[in-house]
Amino acid sequence: MKFIAAVPNFSEGRRLDIVDEIANAMAKTPGVKLLAKESDPSHNRSVITIGGDPDSVLEACIIGVKKAVELIDLTKHKGEHPRIGACDVLPFVPFGTSTMDDAKALAEQAGKIIAEELGIPVYFYEESARRPERVDLAYIRNRQFETVRDKVAEDPDLEPDLGPKQLHPTAGAVMVGARKPLIAFNVNLGTTNVEIAKEIAKHLRSKTGGLAFVKALG
């Protein structure tokens, strides 16, 4: 049996009852196992990891996106992490006998459902990107919900790959893609000076001359 993991990121990390409701709804899907659930109140963001056969994982992810649309209002969201959606990022990761093409096909299916059935615009990134500049998740996402919402109708650079040409008023858009496994972690610094954190991140980040393939946010 092919195994696919999905690691949706949700723009809620403080109201843990909401996070639990989303995670539990996804975990009830037959054929899916909840592998991890992590919340960060400073980022106001949660990462939920599920795994299973491709069809079951797809079904669970759509359930998670629907719950996020129902329970998360980005107009009231504040946090340290960039975001453009209630379900902000939806990556599919192949494991075992699954291939990147399997993950890409699943990302395409998910994007189509999110755009056509839920009416939420979709941007494809990483291996699923339809424009070379959008391989980098940050290219769209770092502009933040408010900026993309206000400029998407007039800026061709912000046009979604699928779905409406305007963001959902409270749920924004979803970044969907296939990617390789990713290790993400936080480092606590012994200072309250955010400029020090930004400088360290700059030296680590590949985009600004640091280590290859490393992304960093200070």
Where are these regions (language model features)?
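A structural signal for small-residue-enriched, beta-sheet-centric alpha/beta enzyme cores
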Residues: 2-14, 19, 30-45, 78-93, ...
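Active-site cofactor/substrate anionic-group-binding motifs, chiefly glycine-
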Residues: 22-29, 33, 37-38, 52-83
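Short, conserved charged micro-motifs
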Residues: 14-18, 55-60, 98-105, 192-199
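Extracellular glycan-interaction surfaces
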Residues: 48
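Residues forming well-ordered secondary-structure scaffolds
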Residues: 101-109, 113, 117, 180
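Short amphipathic alpha-helices in soluble, non-transmembrane regions
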Residues: 22, 60-67, 104-111, 199-203
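Acidic/histidine-enriched active-site and ligand-binding environments that engage anionic O-linkages
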Residues: 66, 72-76, 111-121
